[in-house]
Regions:
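Surface-exposed short loop/turn segments
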Residues: 150-191, 201-219, 236-275
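A short, hydrophobic beta-strand-centered structural micro-motif
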Residues: 133-154
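Compositionally biased alpha-helical segments
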Residues: 20-121, 125-140, 169, 232, ...
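Short secondary-structure boundary motifs at beta->alpha junctions and helix caps
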Residues: 111-128, 189-209, 213-215, 227-235
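Extracytoplasmic low-complexity/disordered linkers and repeat tracts associated with LysM-containing
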Residues: 83-86, 95, 103, 184-191, ...
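Bacterial Sec-dependent N-terminal signal peptides
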Residues: 1-23
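Short, flexible N-terminal segments of the mature chain
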Residues: 38-50, 207-232
């Protein structure tokens, strides 16, 4: 009877303590805290028994469960679409609003170029091709949003007796981000001690190409080491017949396979590897 009373009191105490805190659920962690203020782009909070005020951007918050049981979700985080593979490139968002990428994880720089074939080329279609290419490269990198930093578009120029004409051209550049990185510990737990794998598919995008190419790609892939570089999973490994490449970034994984990204000068690669 005495043990039952002690157990009951322990449960009641823990429940009371939990009820005195708020919980922020971000894309990467659960934060037990006391929410102090919700601003236009961030949530300010402090940890239990601390006065220091911390901030987290709404872009990375899934929801807040307040101590009174109320749940608040944020449209900023739910608006991002998941990239499961290179074919999900249409899920990539392009923005020129800097506040929309606050708190997100930077993946890398991206750029694309599209040019018409003749001086009669449709300028809007050329621009659409450039945006499509930019999204494809971002998806290959595992990003789901691009902050566009530069856009240069030139229309068709008809030639003359002393001057040759030129077709419409669009050049884009920006920075690729994601709202959720693959979890390092989950990836290591999934592959365990296994180090020898086989690839199944390769996606390739040349800077001068208008479309991504996907081919059956059956090579051996050996993992030498796995490191966590500011949340990004990096593999030092050996890809059969590709000895120039040693560093690969894990962009996605599930129970069946994982995908890595690497680049060579102006060519981007995404390789799918069987678990």
């Amino acid at each position: 009877m005495k043990n039952q009373i002690i157990t009951f009191l322990a449960i009641a105490l823990s429940t009371t303590c939990f009820g005195q805190t708020d919980t922020i659920f971000s894309n990467s962690e659960k934060i037990v805290c006391s929410v102090k203020e919700i601003t236009s782009d961030a949530v300010k909070y402090s940890f239990p028994d601390e006065d220091l005020i911390n901030s987290i951007y709404k872009n990375v918050i899934q929801k807040i469960v307040f101590k009174n049981g109320r749940v608040q979700t944020f449209a900023e985080a739910t608006s991002f679409k998941k990239i499961n593979g290179v074919d999900d490139f249409e899920n990539v968002t392009i923005t020129q609003v800097e506040s929309e990428i606050k708190g997100l994880f930077k993946i890398g720089d991206v750029s694309s170029k599209a040019k018409g074939t003749t001086t009669l080329s449709n300028q809007e279609r050329v621009k659409e091709r450039a945006y499509r290419k930019l999204k494809i490269v971002a998806a290959m990198m595992g990003a789901n949003i691009i902050y566009l930093t530069n856009q240069r578009t030139e229309g068709n120029k008809m030639g003359g007796y002393y001057q040759s004409g030129s077709s419409a051209e669009t050049n884009l550049s920006g920075v690729a981000y994601t709202n959720q990185l693959p979890n390092f510990n989950d990836f290591k737990l999934l592959i365990g001690e296994k180090r020898n794998f086989s690839t199944t598919e390769q996606a390739k995008m040349w800077s001068s190409a208008s479309e991504m190419t996907k081919t059956v790609f059956q090579k051996s892939f050996i993992i030498n080491s796995i490191t966590n570089e500011n949340g990004i999973i990096m593999i030092n490994g050996d890809l059969q017949e590709e000895s120039r490449y040693k560093n690969f970034r894990v962009v996605s994984f599930d129970k069946e396979s994982f995908s890595v990204y690497y680049e060579d000068k102006s060519t981007s690669y995404n390789v799918k590897i069987k678990m």
